[in-house]
UniProtKB/Swiss-Prot annotation:
Residues 19-39, 300-319, 505-524 are annotated as: Disordered. Residues 512-524 have a biased composition (Low complexity). It is found in: Nucleus speckle. GO terms for molecular function: DNA binding; mRNA binding; RNA binding; zinc ion binding. It comes from Arabidopsis thaliana. One of its GO terms (biological process) is cell fate determination. One of its GO terms (cellular component) is nucleus. Residues 24-35 have a biased composition (Pro residues). Highly expressed in inflorescences, at intermediate levels in leaves and stems and at lower levels in roots. Its main location: nucleus. This is Zinc finger CCCH domain-containing protein 37. The keyword RNA-binding applies.
Amino acid sequence: MAHRQLYSYALQPSYAAAASTVSPAPPPPQQPLPPKTGLSSLYGSSADHYFPDTTYRFLARDGSEALSNYSGTLASSSSMYHHLPNTTASHLAYPQLLQHQEVAWPPGVEVPGAASAVEPLPPGVKRTSEALYYPTLLGAHNTIGQTEAWYTTDYFTKRPKLESTSHLPIYPQRAGEKDCTHYMQTRTCKFGESCRFDHPIWVPEGGIPDWKEAPVVPNEEYPERPGEPDCPYYIKTQRCKYGSKCKFNHPREEAAVSVETQDSLPERPSEPMCTFYMKTGKCKFGLSCKFHHPKDIQLPSSSQDIGSSVGLTSEPDATNNPHVTFTPALYHNSKGLPVRSGEVDCPFYLKTGSCKYGATCRYNHPERTAFIPQAAGVNYSLVSSNTANLNLGLVTPATSFYQTLTQPTLGVISATYPQRPGQSECDYYMKTGECKFGERCKFHHPADRLSAMTKQAPQQPNVKLSLAGYPRREGALNCPYYMKTGTCKYGATCKFDHPPPGEVMAKTTSEADAAGATNTDTTQ
């Protein structure tokens, strides 16, 4: 009984007097009303939904007219009381009509003036959730001043729920919490009652698609919590997305980013080498780097005189560190990249098959068939120290002739591809002799493929190689990939022709001139 009384008609003290004046007097004796009089005659029937029931209650000239006309309509149209008898539904629809009936209140409870007009709910009948949001049902809360709430510019003002949103679901109201983003945009929330955000009832059906939460001005001051573990993200980046809500410590004395020394960098033998660390001896990621940083790395500290050549650096910032030099490679692979036996394999080359540093890279670029000038019978005196300046090719730019190499004289360097007997053979390896996955490939790479290629090599005719190391096959079609990119992944084994760029341009010009002359003769 006390629970039902708790949700009964409870008015605020400031509106008690006004509510008492609004409560209608006991209905007078039944008299025929003149047709089309009162507020209802001006704005249509009492069931007109353009004006809520609050308008009829507080603006009607004759309160008894609005109450008598509206109570029957509300009782018949409300879906909240369809399971109750007609008499009970009419009583619950508008309890002010029962003002003259006596209401029992617990002893010691002060009965408000207007609250005495509310009839207690029958046994077994509970108030629904709609009664708490409808201003006019069961006297859930008073409606004075709610019209101003609809027209206020205050964003945090809670608007009352009107007839137009009666069919929409009701989600938890949590004043002071952030608005539920999904609810504001769609008017739905999959979390329902368990959602911890606020769900304003004034949001229209379908939500506000372009609604966005007001941006919060970031606060650079993070909380210091002595005794708590340090925030790892703050220690690394000096930022914390949780801000003042973070439960970890944010020490200010460690705000300055410390320069990581070589001894403090992580060693991860099972991971690939850190490329930047191997070239510069430093790593900007510090302890957060996931690659390996060996301590016994040796960086060249002085330039080395190699003939008349000038030491070239492997880094673009060579001007800032002139002491970092490298030894020019004696030979290059078919892609013009240096082959340096004993050096660490270039990780970028192993992954992508290319290297942005080209001939200046100081790492090894292995290939199944590397062209060694000594093995090919080329006079090594032609290969000067200026070989380091070459981006492509085997010899210096001064040698304008093509080196004619026969297949038996080509040095063969085997790459380390895994042999997995019982597994399927790697198709790409069997076709090209290369595998971009290297040791990580899960397929079989038979070693007898090398012997098969060596046996077939003497039967092949002489191959004329260009300065870039690609074969010249007169009469064959031009390699389409080479014509587009200037490179060829098949190298010397490609069956197409690889003409130099100058020859291609000259051939194109001559064909254009011939076509123009033909058109001129046809016109004449």
